[in-house]
């Protein structure tokens, strides 16, 4: 088998993944995959023209995955992260999402997320590097 970089836009990997995953869904559930189950989001906060906070992720089926949440150090402690988490929960409820998932490293914001109702469901030590661990967290919407 030959491995090579993608140089053509005829079939991008996303198209391939979608085709294969749709086939798996339809085989498992014995029905067509509904439209609108996958979407991405990017939310940001600005102070004038300055970007001071951002959050992005994906929604697949009934789960939201927060990929990144960052607050400019000059703006930390002003509840911007809390506003994003509250907004994500409200938005998730509106569109029928039942759980919000995220990961955070040992030197990041585990306690912040616990304060906002997230639970740790997994932990890997020395990931992504020695001396650092990653927490896997979930918030179940009621």
Language model segments and positions:
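Acetyl-CoA-dependent GNAT
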Residues: 4-67, 72
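Short beta-strand-to-coil "C-cap" segments at the C-terminal boundary of structured domains/repeats
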Residues: 138-142
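Short glycine/proline-centered loop/turn elements that form peptide/ligand docking sites
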Residues: 81, 85, 106-109, 126-132
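Conserved catalytic-core motifs of GNAT/GCN5-like acyltransferases
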Residues: 101-103, 119-136
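Conserved GNAT acetyl-CoA-binding A-motif
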Residues: 92-105
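Conserved acetyl-CoA-binding loop-helix of GNAT-fold acetyltransferases
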Residues: 77-90, 115
């Amino acid at each position: 088998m030959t491995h090579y970089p993608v140089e053509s836009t005829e079939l991008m990997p996303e198209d391939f993944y979608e085709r294969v995953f749709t086939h798996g869904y339809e085989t498992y559930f014995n029905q067509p995959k509904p439209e609108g189950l996958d979407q991405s989001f990017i939310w940001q906060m600005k102070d004038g023209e300055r970007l001071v906070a951002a959050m992005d992720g994906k929604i697949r089926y009934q789960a939201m995955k927060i990929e990144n949440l960052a607050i400019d150090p000059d703006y930390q402690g002003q509840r911007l992260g809390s506003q994003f988490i509250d907004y994500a929960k409200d938005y998730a409820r509106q569109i029928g999402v039942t759980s919000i998932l995220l990961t955070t490293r040992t030197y990041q914001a585990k306690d912040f997320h616990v304060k906002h109702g997230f639970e740790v469901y997994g932990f890997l030590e020395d990931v992504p590097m020695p001396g650092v661990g990653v927490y896997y967290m979930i918030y179940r919407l009621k």
